[in-house]
C-alpha cells in the first residue's frame, strides 16, 4: 500500500477536485455512492502511482576562506 502521507495528499487533492466538479454542476446527476467510489478509486490510484517524499535539505557549514598574501 502507499505511504500514509501520500495517500493523505491524494485524498485531499481528489476531494478538492470532486468539490469543484460538484459545485460547477458536472456531477449533478451522480449519486453519493458513485461520487464516493470515484473519490476512493482515484485517490488510491494516485497514491499508488505517485510517492510523496520530503525534500532533502542539505546544510553545508560555511567555512571562512582566508587568502595569505605576502606584501613586500
Curated annotation (Swiss-Prot):
Subcellular location: Host membrane
Protein name listed in UniProt: Putative transmembrane protein ORF72
Keywords assigned by UniProt, alphabetized: Host membrane, Membrane, Transmembrane, Transmembrane helix
Source organism (scientific name): Acidianus bottle-shaped virus (isolate Italy/Pozzuoli)
GO CC annotation terms, alphabetical: host cell membrane; membrane
Taxonomic lineage of the native organism: Viruses, Viruses incertae sedis, Ampullaviridae, Bottigliavirus, Bottigliavirus ABV
Domain of life: Viruses
Transmembrane stretches, start-end: 7-27, 32-52
Topology with respect to the bilayer: Multi-pass membrane protein
